[in-house]
Structures are given as structure tokens and as C-alpha cells.
Amino acid sequence: MAEENNEKKKPSSPRKRTPKKNMSLLPDEGQMIQYSLFDTKQKINESTSTLMDLRVSPFMPVDKISHNSALAREFVANKNILKRETAFGTVEIRNRLLTQYHKMILDCIMVHNVRSVVYKGTIAIYFSIYEIAQQLGLEWNGKTQKNIQEAIEYIKDVVIVRTDADNPSITSSYNIIQEMKYSSKEQAYVIVLSSQYAEYFNKTISINYNKRFDELIAIRGKGSAFIRSIIEFFITHDASADNIQRMKLMQLLETINYPCETPRQITSAKQYLKEYENELAKFSIKYYSGSQLFEYSGTTDIRFIPPLDGFID
């Protein structure tokens, strides 16, 4: 596997290709792999995210975390572990804290990748950092490239431990990314998903919101990470005009791990809800300030992908 530290200053966009024998940067793909991995690859190709990565998200509802914030201090005091318990399940984030910035980058890789291949018991995904910068509306320069690379390395460092609310005895532990490298041959970066994450993807519900993704990441400005987190949470629910999902403000803030220890933080949350009312409405989310109640009546172009049968050995 060829390695380089950087892409060219402004690399050309890699073209999507039809996989051919022995063409891959990653050799011997599929030759000694169980067939279930090809099903998993197809499932990942058809998904934007796992449902639980949105509903009980390891990504904090902010774009940046200050080192002296209460959340960061709690994380360090607890030996770099953050545990979140919700009505939908429990998640532990270990080693590093992740934000909506990291989530957008990961989603860009999932949605706008060049291609994916089966590789050594897991899945590898080719992508362009330049394309990610374009999708996020960032000016392309060395600093932007470095920041995105570092963000992906952050994701690689994190260990996620999940417990299902319905089955507390079932626990999943995984890194999302096993490694990241650059191929001069392909003119693209490649991330290799950990085999544990591929297994988790295989056995859990995933969600496809690709058709709404560009609209979601176009929500920008102060408070936008908070609003995106709300949208990501609600779209995991199978709602409709005849099956409206409702939730009180404080329950939602606790579920998405929004800091609400002080009256000022709650006031800020309410102000963001007012400022981004139209963006929420595009995803059929309505907030009633008087009763402090959310209503969600379902979003078009959202698709749920069921778990595959069996597990990856």
C-alpha cells in the first residue's frame, strides 16, 4: 500500500471506477472473505449512518469543544471516558471527544466517496479530502487539509461502547476507523473500517438520508451543530402525520447531550430553536416554545435498512 503524507495542493477529483480484478490499492480483496462481507459492503454503500450513531450519538452537538469547558473537564477527570445514558441506550466514548464537525466529515466520506472494497475481513472506502472541504464550504489550503486529516485521526482513536436499552446484556465495542492512508496511484485517501464496526453495521439498523445530506450540512452558523443534532435524532424515528413523535425540550437536550447545567445554556438553546425554525421545518420538526414541546411528523427521502442475518466471524 503506497503512502504519502499529503494530497497535491489542489488535487483533481478522483473518478468513480468500476472495480476490476487486481486494480485495487488494497490487494487480494474478496479472495478469502466470507460472502457476508459483500452483503455488509452493500449495506454500508446504501447507508449514511447507523441509526444508533444518530439516536444515541457519540458526537457532541457542538462543532468545537473548549479544553476548559465543563464537558472537557468531566472527560479528563473520568480518565478520558464519557458515558451517556438515555432512554434509547447507553454509549461510552473513550480516548477522545467527537463533535458534529467529525460527524459531518464521516458522513461526507460515506455519501461522497469514490468507491468501497472488501479488504481483509472488513471494508475500505476511498475518498478525497479536497471534496470534503468543498462539501463543507471550507477554503482549500494546507491548514484545511491538515485539520480534516487530524479530524479523521481523532475518529480513529475513539473507542465506542454501546449497550442496547431493550437488551442490556448486549454490548458492542468498536473503533469506527482502523487506519487511514493515501494512495498516489488512486489519487485518493482510503479509510479501513474496523472489523468490529463492520460487524456492528451488519447487525444493526442503518439509515439512508443521502438525498437530504447536502441540505443538512448546509445548515451553518452559531448553533447550527445543535440544530443538526436535533434533526439527526428525529429522523431516526418512523413518524408520519398519523404517527407524530413528541418530546419535551429538556428530555431532548439530555438525550443529545447538549450542555444544560445553567439557565444561560438553556436560554441559548431556545434562541437557536427560534433562529433555525425554518431549517427544522424543512425536516418536519416543529418546536412549540410555550409548551416547550417538539413534534416530528416524518421526513421524506429517508430510508431505513434492516440488519443483515448472521454475524461476521
Regions found by a protein language model. Give the residues of each.
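Charged, alpha-helix-forming regions
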Residues: 2-313
